[in-house]
């Protein structure tokens, strides 16, 4: 039984048929079924193997493309951190492989040749749930290198689970005149419903626009009509599987992009770039990693806060209830944090809306204990911002800056139509 063979595998009480795929575990057989889904089976539990059709061993070597630069098009660098958005499929085995040479990208999405001169580079190849602050720094360094080498726009292919964390981190870390677009895919490129190709087409188009800042680009609705460009500090993944999982929160998207006709329609004001400074990049990648994000719930114990304080944490972001509250039984832990110079700040777990700790006595008492209200900041954004502040400023200055807008993370007022 070799990769590419179509087989029938009999277990104790069921039978599976499909194409044998590469497996990372020698004790597991992975097959792709006709439904398009993969299944991994323990070799020890397989009672009988029947090869229904022999397949050719997959060959991944491809002749090079003649990719001449078009002087009329902008130079866009696509950086990969992992994820499925820019992978390619071996159609003999059904296996999905990273596609991050420029040749691979053009083969996977040939429409890119009409939009920009493409350069592909792998930074990381990880599942996004394994993202670390150290990897944010690596990504920022790679962005700086590409811009200094002539990139006029950056696209970052990223797994969707933590993409909004990375977008927030890069917003605080990177100051540049070029657009930095994070893009992902909710459906793998081996599925008919994949959103990968349209998302990357729209992302590259966005990267050619005369704008600056960090953005997230994903499907704007469940069909294949438009993609939305979201501000990097005002976006969140709000559905586990829908293709339009990413939404702007407390704000409208920056733009709507039609990937078929390559049309960008701006929905609100955007930061325009200064072309005279296009190669200038300033990085600030200093982070205090001893910051925690805690969700408040009925019965939450002060011992949780004490644990973080006793283990050297410098900052705590609370996802409070409603307008920014905790149970009174949690006040003891907040006092303990304050006594030990651990900065505590408050967001709301409602996601939409803003913290207002002046309405009820609970909120006012929390403020008296030193808790900083985070206005309409998303919890994940506040988490990253506090890491950034404590990595660069002292305790008192960090407290002062926490509730002030730095890179678009706070709105003075909320659009009620959002």
UniProtKB/Swiss-Prot annotation:
Reactions catalysed, as given in the entry: L-glutamyl-tRNA(Gln) + L-glutamine + ATP + H2O = L-glutaminyl-tRNA(Gln) + L-glutamate + ADP + phosphate + H(+)
One Pfam family per UniProt: GatD_N
List its EC numbers. Answer: 6.3.5.-
PROSITE patterns, A to Z:
ASN_GLN_ASE_1, ASN_GLN_ASE_2, ASN_GLN_ASE_3
Q: Which UniProt keywords apply?
A: ATP-binding, Ligase, Nucleotide-binding, Protein biosynthesis
How this chain assembles, per its entry, is:
Heterodimer of GatD and GatE.
Query: What is the recorded function of this protein according to its Swiss-Prot or TrEMBL entry?
Result: Allows the formation of correctly charged Gln-tRNA(Gln) through the transamidation of misacylated Glu-tRNA(Gln) in organisms which lack glutaminyl-tRNA synthetase. The reaction takes place in the presence of glutamine and ATP through an activated gamma-phospho-Glu-tRNA(Gln). The GatDE system is specific for glutamate and does not act on aspartate.
In Swiss-Prot or TrEMBL terms, this protein is called: Glutamyl-tRNA(Gln) amidotransferase subunit D
